């Protein structure tokens, strides 16, 4: 098959046209968050899910009752009902953990690992979907 320059150009542009529809900034849930460190990389606490929660979009985590959740941030202001964290991806830990938000009301904090004392401004990457 012979590729014409126009057809080849269309294929190249469609492949390298930028982020896909799944890669996008989503609306911010809050302007501020509480973290344990300045990178928000250390978990504040460990919590246990009291009920199932199905993520409404890619910013959120789907969590099942009984799962251990690592809390990395607590949103402030208008988003104060949501915390940021991760759960292990598979039953035996064979899948990578994913970060996302969930309602604070569905978990019970069982262990404080490092108190959340640092107020951080959120940015677009805090609510970016991939």
Curated annotation (Swiss-Prot):
Q: Which Pfam families match?
A: SH3_2 (PF07653)
Q: Which residues form the SH3 domain?
A: 42-112
SMART domains, A to Z: SH3
Gene Ontology cellular-component terms listed: extracellular region
UniProt xrefs under PROSITE patterns: SH3 (PS50002)
Which InterPro entries does the annotation name? MIA (IPR043369), SH3-like_dom_sf (IPR036028), SH3_domain (IPR001452)
Q: Where in the cell is it found?
A: Secreted
**So which tissues is this one expressed in?**
All malignant melanoma cell lines tested and infrequently in glioma cell lines.
Query: Can you list the disulfide-bonded cysteine pairs?
Result: 35-40, 58-129
Q: How is it modified after translation?
A: May possess two intramolecular disulfide bonds.
Q: Which Gene3D superfamilies match?
A: SH3 Domains
User: What does the entry give for GO biological process?
Assistant: cell-matrix adhesion; extracellular matrix organization
Chief location category: secreted
Ordered alphabetically, the record's keywords are: Disulfide bond, Growth factor, Secreted, SH3 domain, Signal
Q: Which residues form the signal peptide?
A: 1-22
**A Gene Ontology molecular function term of the record:** growth factor activity
On subunit structure and binding partners, the annotation says: Interacts with FASLG.
Instruction: Write out the similarity annotation.
Output: Belongs to the MIA/OTOR family.
So what does this one do? Answer: Elicits growth inhibition on melanoma cells in vitro as well as some other neuroectodermal tumors, including gliomas.
What is the name listed in the Swiss-Prot or TrEMBL entry for this protein?
Melanoma-derived growth regulatory protein
Species name: Mus musculus
């Amino acid at each position: 098959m012979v590729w014409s320059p126009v057809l080849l150009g269309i294929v190249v542009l469609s492949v390298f046209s930028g982020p896909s529809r799944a890669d996008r900034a989503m609306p911010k849930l809050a302007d501020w968050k509480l973290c344990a460190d300045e990178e928000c990389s250390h978990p504040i606490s460990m919590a246990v899910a009291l009920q199932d929660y199905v993520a409404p979009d890619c910013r959120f985590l789907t969590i099942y009752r009984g799962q251990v959740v690592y809390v990395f941030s607590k949103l402030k202001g208008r988003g104060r009902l949501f915390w940021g964290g991760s759960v292990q991806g598979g039953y035996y830990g064979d899948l990578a953990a994913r970060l996302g938000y969930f309602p604070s009301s569905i978990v019970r904090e069982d262990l404080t690992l490092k108190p959340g004392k640092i107020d951080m401004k959120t940015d677009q990457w805090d609510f970016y979907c991939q």
